[in-house]
Amino acid sequence: MNEATKRTIVKEIDAILYEEHKVLDHGFIRVVDYMGSDSAIVQAARVSYGKGTKQISQDEALIKYLMRHHHTTPFEMCEIKFHVKLPIFVARQWIRHRTANVNEYSARYSILDNEFYTPKPEQVAKQSDNNKQGSGEAFDPDTSKEIIDSLINDSNLVYSHYEKFIEQGLAREIARTNLMLNYYTQFYWKIDLHNLLHFLKLRADKHAQYEIRVYAEVMLDIIKKWVPLAYNAFVEYCLESACISRTGLEIIRKLIKGENVTREESNIGKREWGELMSILDKQS
């Protein structure tokens, strides 16, 4: 508790307030404000039966219990506000998480800078053969360079047209429409901890698109500083855990007993079987 402000503060977060954490080639994320800490979570959980502050070890055990049993309300007592600069196509994925408050830079009122995202060669990949919305293996260096050069040339070309439209007096709300999705935008994004952790579980996953995953990874480091007990529980029970179906559990029990189990007799789909075998470090 800070005596001057009469509110709980987290020194590790105060130390990085407004500090830009660089992401991608022109992007960043920074903490603008926050409310609450690990203590706010346990305080909310204990209010129903009037218990006061406990020892750290007891707080940690309670937070693990809440996370393990999906008691979400106490985690909603903490909130954090970010200022994010990111490519428009990343922002469109990001904004699908509708449980936050957001206000975005408006190209109706302001002129966008000539800043666009250019992928690194290793990120210029072919369409995945088994994932309709994901990337597969990278192109050869020559093809990657050709694609990147085209992206850069196209981006510069449309921006030159955008500038010409503005000079001609075209309304900004129309002039912006020819800009590509790799141009950068900015927004303020405020969210409670429960919904933030859900966002991070999806976007920090190895299957998430690289360009949004790198933002999520920076946010994970920030969460670790802000609410370390909740962060550890999240990693333990959500981020690095596995969801296994009833049938999957039956298969595991049989394997523990030394029984031979096949996918066909288990009545389980190929994809789920492969995921289960991957979890168990067994060949499918």
UniProtKB/Swiss-Prot annotation:
Gene Ontology BP term (one): dTTP biosynthetic process
Pfam families: Thy1
Gene3D superfamilies: 3.30.1360.170
Positions of FAD binding: 73, 96-98, 104, 192-194, 198
InterPro entries registered for this protein in UniProt: Thymidylate_synthase_ThyX, Thymidylate_synthase_ThyX_sf
CDD domains for the chain: ThyX (cd20175)
Subunit structure as annotated in this protein's UniProt entry: Homotetramer.
Function text: Catalyzes the reductive methylation of 2'-deoxyuridine-5'-monophosphate (dUMP) to 2'-deoxythymidine-5'-monophosphate (dTMP) while utilizing 5,10-methylenetetrahydrofolate (mTHF) as the methyl donor, and NADPH and FADH(2) as the reductant.
HAMAP family to which the protein is assigned, alphabetical: ThyX
Protein name according to UniProt: Flavin-dependent thymidylate synthase
Name of the encoding gene: thyX
